[in-house]
UniProtKB/Swiss-Prot annotation:
Substrate binds at residues 24-28, 36, 40, 68-70, 72, 74, 185, 191-193. Binds 2 magnesium ions per subunit. GO terms for biological process: polyprenol biosynthetic process. It comes from the Bacteria. Belongs to the UPP synthase family. This is Isoprenyl transferase. Keywords: Magnesium, Metal-binding, Transferase. SUPFAM superfamilies: Undecaprenyl diphosphate synthase. GO terms for molecular function: ditrans,polycis-undecaprenyl-diphosphate synthase [(2E,6E)-farnesyl-diphosphate specific] activity; magnesium ion binding. Catalyzes the condensation of isopentenyl diphosphate (IPP) with allylic pyrophosphates generating different type of terpenoids. The active site is at D23, N71 (proton acceptor).
Length: 248
């Protein structure tokens, strides 16, 4: 059986694909006696800085968890603000991405988004579709279980007689991208919260107490430095790895 793990980069100075849960916006605001929405605003600034630094480092794919299927349970005013911030980012930031030859993709179900947001998504993806630089994928109304289920349902609808790792992987939201090499979660929590459950099977996990609005270039460099020290064996022994990939 052909395994999807062949898309993972086994050893490199810089991870080809970084996935991030941007956690801690609300706590960042609370510590400063500010409304939670101010934390989300600063979180957007942190994302802009991370995109720039990832491109500078040579990262090819950056996938961030912006809004999960479970986040609809948050207070109505916060959800409304997040949707407005999402639309604002689509309208204002996509031009900057396009000017820097970056591609934008939105992952997740779009059934609950209003017409204005749907139009913003379509226009942003179309504008940047042919760019060849860093690909920024934003997971919004996304869940890892939902992703696997929708991929399986697509295959059933196509009448596929046998589902393999390879065929399923190609129907996932990140089906055209290599699997993440490095997963970062800020804010002190040590779980993956239903994010990219299939795709992160072999990702290196990095957890930090830094709240997302404070996650800067230095913090990203520290995460990458940790990644560079890892020995990625994928079931093999250390002795089976090429000399340059063995950990001292």
């Amino acid at each position: 059986m052909k395994s999807s793990t062949q898309t993972i980069l086994e050893h490199t100075a810089i991870p080809r694909h970084i996935a991030v849960i941007m956690d801690g916006n609300g706590r960042w605001a609370k510590k400063r006696f500010l409304p939670r929405i101010m934390g989300h605003k600063r979180g957007l600034d942190a994302l802009e800085n991370m995109v720039k630094h990832c491109a500078k480092l040579g990262v090819q794919y950056l996938t961030v968890f912006a809004f999960s299927t479970e986040n609809w349970r948050r207070p109505e005013d916060e959800v409304s603000f997040l949707m407005g911030l999402f639309l604002q980012a689509l309208q204002k930031q996509v031009r900057r991405l396009h000017e820097n030859n970056m591609r934008l993709k939105i992952l997740g179900s779009r059934e609950r988004f209003n017409r204005q947001i749907l139009q913003g998504i379509e226009e942003a993806e179309a504008l940047t579709a042919n760019n060849t630089g860093l690909t920024l994928s934003i997971a919004a109304d996304y869940g890892g279980r939902w992703d696997i289920l929708q991929a399986a349902n697509k295959l059933i609808a196509e009448g596929v007689s046998e589902i393999t790792e390879d065929t399923l992987a190609k129907h996932l939201m990140l089906g055209d991208a290599p699997e993440p090499d490095l997963f970062i979660r800020t804010g002190g929590e040590t779980r993956i919260s239903n994010f990219l459950l299939w795709q992160m099977a072999y990702a290196e996990l990095y957890f930090t107490d830094i709240l997302w609005p404070d996650f800067d270039e230095t913090a990203l460099d520290a995460a990458v430095a940790s990644f560079q020290k890892r020995e990625r064996r994928f079931g093999r022994t250390s002795e089976q790895l090429p000399i340059g990939q063995q950990r001292n």
